[in-house]
């Protein structure tokens, strides 16, 4: 039987020493008079822990003399004290045939058989001992403990409780504690051990038992607090210190705690580990404990969000040929994922597949990392595997009523996120709306539904959804984060700052919080906008040949939340039959961006036809709702004035009004009406209808139909620039957007445009329009968005089809 310094497994052995000594004194009066006989001297030595002299003496003595039952009982008890269980059983079997032995001898044999795990034989002897001495507490206790060892749980617990009910002494409570230990009821055992210590605060055995029970229940700091009251080996003391530090790591890694409290616990644990490792380093016996401390320390580093240090320490352990167990590898995997190093994380997951189903993967960070890196098949397999193991209901042992399965709800949520990330937003919204409607008290689902509405370009609907969810838990971090994202889309700058400040103060190291803080940081950066167009081959009368145009504009960081200053330069030139035409424009202005509104006022100096003229532009837009937006623009010396007109000294003032209807990311239309007044007294009206219809999508590709209808009328046709009396164009194009590479905030994609239509001009026959285009685009780190596009089109001008091949470059850089 296992002997533990924390378990009272051999209570009979120790408690019966005193009773044996008293019995021996009564049996041998000479001992009382001075203990002058050799036998009596050996008995006294055995009482003091020197068992060998007595056992050796008795071995020789029994060869020359017949032993009395009392002497055999002495032999059995001293051999039991010496831990010679085989000898006890052997002597018992030899002498119990010839003589009736005293109860104490029978009990010694019963204990030896118990130590040998011969439970049934031991129980039989305990019953025999109790029949000889029915009032013996020691024998009754030994019998109950053996019942517990034999896994006769019901009988052992019943007898132990009866014993305590008769008298709640320390010995009886210790017996009940032992039964609870064998039954695995560690919390019940903790209660009993606490009661024992309340009765005898200085009881060393009770202190040791309580310390062991606290350790089994992972209440390690109080267990360490008892260490100075109990005699422990250095290894046992180190184990308690490690357990106490590990308790801090577990507490720090609990998501339900406030972030500041978690980081404080993590820093405390790190300080303890550093102190322990430094103190134990000179001791070679402590080498295994140092390795354990270093492995446990990975959890403290992870809880402290020191992900890079987690990886460095893990690599050091591997370099030293140390094995990191499965229960610790999750910290390393999560650290790799947090640092956006998914490849080594996947390698470790392949080596430790049990991590996928462990509690360390409750946040499903691997799934979101797969989505962020465009590994959609792997993400789909992740969802499918999780869903297979998450039925709608689960049955709990002992309960006749099926219970809802939280894992099923998590699986549905993961599936919605997968659909949203793979461009299947209608299906994602339908599922999330159903989940949110059937669980109105689940704030997480309401927030996820709002996020999905925002992804579909409906921030006001998302705001309303979040407002309803606010009543459930107003101070929720997840809620405030999503409200900040929506406020950013709605241009609620002050609200966004307040929410972000609060979220950052409460969870500064949370990755989702850092992402939000990064978005706000980008919002407060300056903005450089650049666009360049170059005609490679063109013979049309609008742009001329070898045309070149570019525009640069720099916007300041936000001022007083809604204002930005801007300034820049525009240039355009082209070759025409009558010579080269050019336009240069320096401009500066102010932008206004409160909620639901946008406006720009621009003042400029325009150089064309050898002279400078002042220009003014006023642009405005109003978001009536998520669906409707209207706007307009007034401009003196309009940018839409044909370059050829400027070449010939003709400029135009222009006014435009437009209305946009937006259903979601799959459908939108825009209609505009514009009127231009040229200085040569020409009056132009323009009407445009354009739209987008999503036809097809995959995780990496979208296919859109872009219909267009435009018409114009000019009051004069005898102009130096292209000015048809009436014209009408109807086109339809297919636009493909294909993601070539995606890794977190870096996305590289290619675009393909192919379309055609018909063009009608008054006094000329209708002609075909053909449009082709190919381009690529790169978005990097939320601060660079740039693309290049090669376009070719062929359409009629005054009845003659002309070609135009051009390349355009645009960039938006935040700095």
Residue ranges and their predicted role:
Residues 58, 68-70, 74-77, 85, ...:
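Gram-negative and organellar
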Residues 31-75, 81, 90, 104:
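N-terminal leader/linker segments that initiate helical-solenoid repeat arrays
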Residues 2-33:
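Gram-negative bacterial Sec-dependent N-terminal signal peptides
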Residues 1-7, 51, 513:
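Disordered, low-complexity tails and leader-like regions
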Residues 4, 9-11, 36, 70, ...:
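Short linear motifs centered on Gly/Pro in flexible linkers and helix caps
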């Amino acid at each position: 039987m296992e002997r533990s310094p924390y378990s009272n497994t051999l209570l009979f052995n120790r408690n019966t020493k005193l009773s044996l000594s008293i019995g021996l004194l009564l049996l041998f009066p000479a001992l009382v008079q001075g203990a002058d006989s050799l036998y009596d001297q050996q008995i006294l030595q055995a009482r003091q822990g020197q068992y060998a002299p007595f056992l050796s003496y008795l071995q020789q003595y029994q060869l020359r003399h017949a032993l009395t039952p009392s002497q055999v009982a002495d032999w059995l008890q001293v051999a039991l004290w010496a831990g010679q269980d085989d000898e006890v059983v052997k002597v018992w079997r030899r002498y119990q045939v010839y003589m009736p032995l005293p109860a104490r001898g029978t009990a010694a044999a019963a204990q030896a058989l118990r130590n040998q795990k011969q439970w049934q034989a031991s129980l039989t002897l305990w019953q025999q001992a109790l029949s000889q001495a029915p009032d013996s507490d020691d024998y009754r206790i030994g019998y109950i403990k053996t019942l517990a060892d034999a896994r006769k749980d019901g009988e052992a617990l019943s007898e132990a409780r009866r014993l305590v009910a008769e008298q709640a002494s320390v010995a009886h409570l210790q017996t009940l504690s032992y039964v609870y230990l064998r039954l695995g009821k560690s919390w019940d055992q903790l209660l009993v051990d606490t009661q024992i210590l309340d009765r005898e605060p200085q009881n060393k055995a009770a202190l040791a038992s309580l310390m062991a029970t606290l350790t089994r229940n992972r209440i390690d700091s109080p267990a360490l607090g008892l260490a100075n009251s109990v005699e422990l080996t250095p290894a046992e003391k180190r184990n308690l210190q490690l357990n106490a530090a590990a308790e801090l790591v577990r507490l720090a890694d609990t998501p339900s705690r406030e972030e500041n409290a978690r980081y404080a616990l993590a820093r405390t644990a790190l300080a303890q580990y550093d102190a322990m490792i430094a103190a134990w380093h000179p001791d070679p016996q402590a080498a295994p404990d140092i390795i354990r401390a270093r492995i446990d320390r990975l959890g403290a580093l992870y809880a402290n969000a020191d992900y890079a240090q987690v990886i460095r320490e893990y690599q050091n352990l591997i370099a030293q040929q140390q094995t990191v167990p499965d229960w610790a590898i999750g910290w390393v995997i999560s650290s790799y994922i947090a640092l956006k190093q998914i490849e080594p994380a996947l390698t470790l997951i392949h080596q430790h597949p049990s991590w996928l189903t462990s509690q360390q993967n409750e946040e499903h960070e691997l799934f979101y990392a797969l989505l962020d890196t465009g590994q959609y098949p792997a993400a789909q397999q992740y969802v499918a595997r999780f869903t297979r193991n998450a039925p709608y209901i689960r049955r709990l042992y002992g309960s006749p009523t099926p219970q809802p399965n939280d894992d099923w709800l998590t699986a549905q949520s993961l599936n919605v996120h997968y659909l949203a990330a793979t461009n299947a937003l209608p299906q994602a919204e339908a599922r999330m709306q159903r989940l949110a409607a059937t669980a109105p008290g689940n704030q997480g689902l309401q927030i996820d539904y709002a996020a999905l509405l925002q992804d579909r370009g409906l921030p006001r609907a998302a705001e309303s959804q979040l407002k309803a969810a606010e009543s459930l838990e107003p101070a929720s971090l997840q809620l405030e984060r999503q409200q900040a994202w929506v406020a950013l889309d709605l241009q609620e700058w002050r609200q966004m700052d307040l929410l972000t400040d609060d979220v950052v103060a409460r969870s500064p190291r949370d990755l989702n919080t850092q992402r939000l803080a990064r978005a706000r940081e980008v919002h407060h950066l300056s903005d450089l906008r650049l666009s360049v167009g170059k005609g490679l081959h063109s013979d049309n009368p609008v742009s001329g040949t070898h045309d070149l145009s570019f525009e640069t504009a720099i916007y300041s960081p936000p001022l007083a939340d809604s204002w930005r200053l801007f300034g820049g330069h525009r240039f355009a030139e082209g070759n025409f039959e009558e010579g080269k035409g050019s336009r240069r424009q320096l401009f500066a202005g102010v932008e206004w961006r409160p909620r639901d509104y946008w406006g720009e006022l621009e003042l400029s100096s325009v150089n064309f036809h050898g002279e400078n003229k002042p220009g003014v532009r006023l642009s405005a837009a109003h978001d009536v709702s998520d669906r409707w937006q209207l706007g307009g623009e007034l401009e003196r010396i309009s940018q839409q004035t044909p370059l050829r007109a400027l070449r010939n000294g003709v400029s135009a003032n222009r006014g435009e009004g437009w209305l946009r209807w937006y259903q979601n990311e799959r459908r939108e239309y825009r209609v505009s009406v514009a009127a231009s007044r040229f200085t040569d007294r020409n009056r132009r009206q323009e009407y445009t209808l354009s739209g987008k219809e999503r036809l097809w999508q995959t995780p990496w590709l979208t296919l859109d139909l872009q219909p267009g209808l435009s018409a114009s009328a000019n009051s004069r046709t005898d102009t130096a620039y292209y000015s048809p009396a009436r014209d009408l164009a109807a086109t339809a194009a297919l636009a493909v957007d294909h993601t070539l590479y995606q890794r977190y905030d870096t996305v590289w994609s290619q675009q393909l445009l192919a379309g055609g239509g018909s063009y009608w001009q008054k006094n000329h026959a209708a002609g075909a329009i053909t449009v082709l285009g190919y381009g690529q685009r790169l978005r990097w780190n939320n601060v660079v968005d740039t693309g290049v596009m090669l376009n070719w089109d062929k359409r009629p001008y005054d009845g003659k089809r002309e070609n135009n091949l051009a390349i355009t470059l645009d960039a938006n850089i935040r700095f």
